[in-house]
Amino acid sequence: MSDFKSIPGGICAPKGFSAAGVHCGIRHNHSKLDLALIKADVRCAGAGCYTTNKVYGAPITVDREHLKDGYAQAIVVNSGNANTCAPNGVQLAKDTCDIVAKELGIRADDVLPSSTGVIGQAMSIEPFAKGIPEAAAKLAADEAGSHDAATAIMTTDTHPKEIALEFAVGGKAVRIGAIAKGSGMIHPNMATMLLFMTTDAKVAPAALQKALSTVVPATFNQISVDGDTSTNDTVLLLASGLSGAEIAEGTPDYDTFVAALTEVAEHLSRELAGDGEGATKLLECTVTGAPDLATARAVSKSVIHSTLFKAAMFGADANWGRVLCAIGYTPGDFDISKTSVRLKSKAGEVFVCENAAYHAYSEDEAAVVLKEDEIDILVDLGSGDATAKAWGCDLTYDYVKINGDYRT
């Protein structure tokens, strides 16, 4: 992180971007913003990654179509309705793009729509027709604009999620900004996770897509809150090029750019996992000693996905057998008998399992460690050099309450 400087501004920090959030009427609570608009001053190189669910939101169909040429200039996002499994969904998403294009004076196929909320609900164009002109009038290239947009895309999130950082390329300052939402239905390949990133680096569309496709599997696809892969998972990245710093694939500058994207993605992955519905603790599982990267990723995600282990973490119970169980049912060519497990927080560390067997520890000390709000699960498979991380949260009574009342 020493080469990457944290700065204010969120998604509006890079040159050439403005954002806004308004209440347009999709959500019944008038105090909640439910429409976000992000605009670039110029046509941008664009990249996207989406849900692997066979059922996917209508906006994703439109995004894929609009990004075929590798360029876009605006993103419009609503919360409160997923626009998924609606008979007029695709046409409504296209009509939304038409309204944005008219208000901003850009091409309709340069607009990328996105939605989050309840699946299978009727949706009309009226809230968009009302809200998009209001959002266009409110566009601001500052921290407030980013914050309003980040707030407008929230559903059961408890707080907005934003980040921006700056780094140097060829003596020029390059910035990356991002906003995200996601609290439940998070088990990506990608959560509903929506994440929008901007940069003022000059990157060709193909190189930008490759960079995003490199970062997503190592970060956002390593989050699990509840094991449900959403229908609307979307990550979009726009590059304005207005910093003047050109980044070409296969160069050290490109590697730096990917590292910066990874820094942003890891930060937001932790934010998303820690804000899981009803969560009281962020869980981070680091696997070392794996025979290959795929195994390292699979094992780390298996651990933080285990319902039994997540419940144990809520109760501050060092039930390491549940960790070993989750490792054991994970595919991969490794010798389980070489596995060790440690549990760590700012309160200390306990070594609970060595060579897949009990390692003497104090239950009282373990309880102190596990009462903290961030817990590290350190797994060494002893079978190679590969490593990976995954992020999740504990499973609480409130998760059931939130999802039992979601549509009421």
Model-derived regions: residue spans:
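A structural signal for small-residue-enriched, beta-sheet-centric alpha/beta enzyme cores
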Residues: 2-91, 95, 101-408
